[in-house]
């Protein structure tokens, strides 16, 4: 990618769903990481969103949700391979909420899940953070999602900032 001109055109409003033919997230994400790593000697920060996962949850569309998750899984796989090769790249995977109250029903089998949605809005389900690479250990345990900011600053070796996370008094 270095030294070359390129353009990546996407939807003007919402990106289309995988079921509508959108298959560029894995390749576009890897292209962005490769481009930024070639251009930026001091490192880079890249945010990639699988936004249609949320919309499939709102629609309670299990087929679309599974397809979107598979697409995002391929995106993550590409970026983990990129990070493994470089050795200096931290990959974080998380979300800001769960949508739909998704549950796996009794009687599900490998390759044949029975899924149920409990609502069509956001839930208060705890959201995991998966980390791979240098300083990944900073992201273990249970913490407020707003603490991600401070953990990322620490991982990058930046000066600590005062946390404004609400902590109820005991």
Regions found by a protein language model. Name each.
Residues 1-170:
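Feature captures the catalytic ectodomains and active-site-proximal regions of enzymes
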């Amino acid at each position: 990618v270095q030294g070359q001109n390129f353009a990546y055109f996407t939807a003007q409003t919402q990106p289309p769903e995988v079921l509508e033919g959108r298959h560029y997230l894995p390749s576009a994400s890897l292209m962005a990481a490769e481009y930024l790593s070639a251009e930026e000697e001091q490192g880079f920060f890249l945010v990639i969103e699988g936004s249609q996962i949320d919309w499939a949850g709102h629609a309670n569309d299990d087929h679309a949700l599974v397809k979107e998750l598979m697409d995002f899984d391929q995106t993550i796989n590409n970026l983990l391979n990129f990070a493994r090769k470089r050795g200096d790249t931290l990959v974080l995977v998380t979300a800001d909420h769960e949508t739909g109250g998704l549950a796996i029903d009794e009687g599900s089998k490998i390759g044949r899940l029975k899924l149920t949605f409990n609502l069509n809005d956001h839930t208060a389900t705890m959201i995991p953070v998966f980390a791979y690479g240098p300083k990944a250990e900073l992201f273990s345990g249970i913490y407020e999602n707003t603490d991600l900011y401070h953990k990322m600053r620490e991982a990058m070796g930046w000066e600590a900032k005062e946390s404004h996370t609400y902590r109820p008094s005991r």
